[in-house]
Regions:
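Acidic/glycine-rich phosphate/pyrophosphate-binding loops and surrounding catalytic core
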Residues: 2-195
Length: 195
């Protein structure tokens, strides 16, 4: 998938997440933290696994407050253990508090997927079998979940309905059998190539 399309999808998810979580403002933070208060926070690893989501987290911070400074110590795809510090973020305390939950939710989900994928990849080492993902993803999170699979050592099968024909039982049934489904798919592809 085109990098610009991926970036756009991630940006839209981040914006939607801000709207969902912050709305017209984090009233707790805005009410008790001075606007000019500066601080620093660190992402401390609590479980062993494969780290994923650092690049998305950096984008969360950048989109919310471009003045935030992020120092990354551990890259996506790295095996981590409790006590490791993945990154330190410095900036306005209001910005730190308003972005922390979104960053944590994204990184926990992506790291969980990358860790599980990596376990399967390791079990299959030495065979000719590859771990591939599916379209059975969380609505709105597909791109990030598929990124996590790749970070964990797996591969992406297809992103959506637009990038590959995959005849399944429902297609075969509604087309009136496998022969009809295959021949119609071939005709469709020929027509698509001509246009």
């Amino acid at each position: 998938m085109d990098e610009l399309v991926v970036k756009d999808l991630i940006d839209r998810l981040i914006d939607l997440s801000f709207a969902e979580d912050i709305g017209d403002g984090d009233h707790t933070t805005l009410s008790c933290i001075p606007a000019d208060a500066m601080g620093k926070s660190k992402l401390l690893i609590k479980e062993e696994g494969i780290l994923a989501g650092i690049e998305v987290a950096k984008e969360v911070f950048r989109r919310f407050d471009p003045t935030m400074k992020v120092e990354v110590f551990i890259q996506d795809g790295t095996h981590v253990k409790p006590g490791d510090v993945a990154m330190v973020v410095e900036g306005k305390v209001q910005s730190l508090l308003q972005t922390e939950r979104l960053m944590l939710n994204i990184m926990q989900r992506m790291s969980g997927i990358a860790t599980m994928t990596n376990k399967y990849v390791k079990k299959l080492e030495g065979t000719k079998t590859r771990v591939l993902d599916t379209r059975k993803t969380t609505p709105g999170m597909r791109i990030m979940e598929k990124m996590a699979v790749k970070i964990g050592g797996g591969g992406n099968h297809r992103i959506g309905l637009f990038d590959m024909i995959l005849l399944k039982d429902n297609h075969v049934d509604f087309a009136g059998g496998i022969h009809n489904a295959v021949s119609r798919a071939k005709e469709y592809c020929k027509a698509k190539v001509r246009t």
